[in-house]
Amino acid sequence: ADNALLKAAEVLRRLGGHRPTPQLDDLWIGLLDALGMEGDMRAALMDPERVWDTAVALGDLGGKMLHACSHMSISPNIVQGGQKINMIPDAVHIDVDIRTLPGQDTDYVRAELEAAIGDLADQVDIEVLSDRSASRSPHETPMWGVIESAVKAADPTARVHPGLIVGGTDARYYRPHGATVY
């Protein structure tokens, strides 16, 4: 008999080992600038082939933050399957927490999940429970100019850079209505 729990275990293994495509965009470059990343470290963090391992290697020195700011995260957190000890499960439900970066939509997420799952993708139903894509506000605004001026008044050598908060804030509720949120 086809044991869905065994298949789910393989899906989980593949999700856990998947490395989503890094997003090394203008926000990423600005973050590296703001952090003063230079030389070999910057080169490694700008290399799509090395950014994952470099961020992980930094560990508590900001590695987790750098990793989350450069990659969509995939975290399978809840698994439910089987009813009784003497029944082979025919279905398993896996809840996966996915944190996207700005510009990564549902189609992008689905493509990454299918790439991770590989040849099992046609045997898996992907259901989107929440579609709250990451958002960002433009920083070429009068409000951004005021923020920069205030920071420079306090410290003329300070660098002001749009940040990326991984996780969630209330900004996701206001931006769709046209609000600029920093």
Question: Model features per residue range: what roles?
Answer:
Residues 6, 21-83, 90, 107-111, ...:
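An extended, acidic, His-containing surface patch that forms the Zn2+-binding/catalytic region
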Residues 2, 11, 108-117:
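Short amphipathic alpha-helices in soluble, non-transmembrane regions
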Residues 10, 88-109:
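C-terminal catalytic subdomain
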Residues 1-22:
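A short core secondary-structure module
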